[in-house]
A protein has these predicted regions:
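Short, structured motif recognition centered on aromatic/hydrophobic residues
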Residues: 50-57, 116-118, 128, 168-175
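Short, low-complexity, Pro/Ser/Thr/Gly-rich segments in the mature regions of secreted, periplasmic
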Residues: 171-196
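Boundary at the C-terminal end of the N-terminal hydrophobic targeting segment
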Residues: 22-26
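Short, exposed beta-strand-loop hairpins at the edges of beta-sheets
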Residues: 151-154, 160-169, 174
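N-terminal secretory signal peptides
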Residues: 27-110, 176-184
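Long, charged/polar, surface-exposed segments that mediate recognition or autoinhibition
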Residues: 95-149
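Bacterial N-terminal signal peptides that target proteins for export
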Residues: 2-13
Length: 196
């Protein structure tokens, strides 16, 4: 075999050898175990025996802590009936330039559904009027007190944003409530009525 032929086949041989090494490593090294849930609330709720509302709690919690540097949770639950009683949580989050708090509540009902609510509480270093103009221009405003206004959007009837003047800034409370929430995965896995 001449030198030119060797040089033509050398890259292919090296690639084949590297691929074999990678495949062999995949066979010899067991796959990593699945990562634990990333948010503290999901881990805490799981550890105390909450199951029925866990998918809703996990969904809300993962959205709530997204982008935070760190977070921790204070959890209250019915210790006699952890999976059948209400769960209340307060989450503290650290962001690069601010601290934020959130509250997530889940209450199971007899039908297997859950009532869930989430509130995210933060402070903006701006006036509430400027926050409303920038973020809530299309929302309907209802003034509850001279320093307290609630904004709603007809497209999201179970959500609201409250702005409370707190000079020199604005206290912002974003709220979401859903009644009769059912896990979409459990609903789609259930057999149709009458076909059991």
């Amino acid at each position: 075999m001449n030198t030119q032929a060797l040089l033509r086949w050398l890259p292919a041989a090296l690639a084949w050898a590297a691929a074999g090494t990678v495949c062999a490593q995949g066979v010899l090294v067991p796959p990593a175990p699945p990562a634990p849930p990333q948010d503290t609330l999901t881990r805490a709720a799981t550890s105390v025996g909450i199951k029925r509302c866990l998918p809703a709690i996990s969904r809300l919690s993962s959205l709530t802590v997204q982008g935070s540097r760190s977070h921790d949770v204070l959890l209250d639950w019915d210790r006699k009936r952890p999976d059948a009683g209400p769960m209340f949580s307060l989450i503290g989050m650290q962001y690069p330039n601010a601290g934020v708090a959130a509250s997530i509540t889940a209450i199971p009902d007899e039908s297997g559904a859950c009532t869930v609510s989430a509130e995210r509480i933060s402070v903006a270093p701006f006036t509430c009027e400027s926050v409303a103009q920038q973020e809530l221009a299309s929302y309907k405003m209802t003034r509850l007190l001279p320093n307290y206004a609630v904004y709603t959007d007809a497209k999201e009837p179970t959500s609201s944003v409250s702005l409370i003047d707190s000079p020199p800034g604005c206290l912002i409370i974003r709220r979401y409530v859903e009644y009769g929430w059912k896990d979409p995965a459990a609903v789609s896995a259930a057999p149709p009525p009458g076909k059991r």
